[in-house]
Amino acid sequence: LFPPYHDPFEEETFIIGPYYTQRAVRRSPFYFTEREKHELMVATAILTLAFAIAFTGGLRGLIFRWRSFILYLVVAALAVITAFALHEIGHKFAAIHFGYWAEFNYFMPGLFIALLFSLAGFLFAAPGAVVIHGYPTRRENGIIAAAGPSVNLALGIFFFSLSSGLNSFAPLAGLLFYFVAAINILIGAFNMIPLPPLDGSKIIAWSLPVYLGMAVLLAIFLFFIYF
């Protein structure tokens, strides 16, 4: 079921699938397998394309507004890298912090659906998730789940502040960062919906105060950005 992995931290160790030594994980908390890097890059590229097509107006916009598509491609790349890729990496590093093997796996049917929806001018995606091998406690699971939306919240605040500072003398850059902030806050807020398999369901099962605190913060910034 799982292909063999060679431990990048202990040359003499040969690892099978999820049975990754905690000693190696703790020595280098930033490990990525070759397959994982490939799948994360593929998922990011496909999502970037889907976002750009949807923002252009779908297939019709792609045909008649191809110059706009090129601009949206740049914007979408920054938005997807920060709002999606760093969100997933946040989950991964939080899991590694607790000593678990964690690896991003893409979901190709979900990525294909994202492309199909984008041609109609809409966005719906199930790009994949970080798979954790082990049995985290409710607390650990809640913290791991909270890491993703927390990354989105932090990046949203950062890019929103950057946008506000640039608006007066670099309005185009300000608009770009405003857009990236909006996508981060939107994705963070969506993931806080307390329904499985979204992050919110795991956070609320661990700590209602933490869930409410994060949800309120995201709701406040969602209001400021979109209204």
Enumerate the predicted regions with their spans:
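Hydrophobic transmembrane alpha-helices and their immediate loop junctions
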Residues: L1-F227
